[in-house]
Design a protein with these regions (language model features):
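Short, well-ordered junction/capping motifs at the entry into regular secondary structure
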Residues: 112-158
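Active-site beta-strand termini and strand-to-loop segments that position acidic
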Residues: 4, 157, 224-225
């Protein structure tokens, strides 16, 4: 983790992986166990590895907690993403520079779900197919986009995977729903761009709250208070 000096919190430099209690890496292309079945699975972050997609907000929160950390707040996450220049993009500009971060791959008409399911219904099963994040030129290893960073030294906060934060929607018809920031590699900037990109989870099943929504695009990283080290 690195310290964000302006806000006095620590954050993982890279998107996280998940590990089982015995230290075995969880397959990053497959949905992790739900929190009630998850036990001591924990989060770690390294450069040059495949980050965990297919993860829900509560799964991510528990993995951070089991590692002695916590999910970042939206304010913390955006502060780390914007860097000391407080820019819209981590590399210090207020406009997108093509190729700096892993975004805008595969336009809607070429979405990888449609490649696998030409008559896609966009079901939970389809959106969590482990093959999606294994396509060439799709999900990248952590830190692969070496220019997708800032002076704090955090990578991939825009693109690659969108990342769950601790905050929930506070009002309106989606009150209590989970929030993911930063967009993902197939994101087209529909819900703002750069560090302002924001997606709100949907309730996709009456027995599972939005905090358990997950698909190929959802990942996370952890934060911590400096005094916890």
């Amino acid at each position: 983790m690195i310290l964000v000096p302006t806000s006095r919190f620590c954050i993982h430099r890279w998107e996280a992986q998940m590990f089982h209690e015995n230290g075995q890496l969880h397959d990053p292309f497959r949905v992790p166990p739900f929190p009630r079945e998850m036990g001591g699975m924990y989060a770690k972050a390294f450069p040059g590895v495949v980050p965990q997609g297919y993860v829900g907000r509560d799964q991510a929160e528990l993995a951070c907690r089991n590692a002695g950390f916590r999910l970042c707040t939206a304010e913390e996450w955006q502060s780390a993403c914007r860097g000391p220049k407080a820019a819209m993009f981590p590399y210090g500009t207020n406009h997108r520079v093509e190729g700096r971060c892993n975004t805008h791959k595969f336009p809607d008409s070429e979405h990888l779900v449609l490649y696998l399911y030409p008559e896609a219904k966009w079901t939970t099963q389809e959106m969590n197919d482990p093959r999606i994040n294994q396509f060439p030129d799709g999900l990248a290893t952590t830190g692969h986009y070496v220019q997708c960073t800032n002076a704090y030294g955090v990578f991939d906060m825009v693109g690659n995977l969108q990342e769950w934060v601790a905050d929930l929607v506070e009002d309106g018809k989606r009150e209590g729903n989970a929030i993911a920031l930063g967009d993902h590699y197939m994101g087209q900037g529909k819900n703002f761009e750069g560090c302002e990109a924001r997606n709100v989870a949907h309730d996709y099943h009456p027995d599972e709250p939005s905090r358990n929504q997950r698909d190929y695009s959802t990942g996370f990283r952890c934060c911590a208070d400096p005094r916890s080290f």
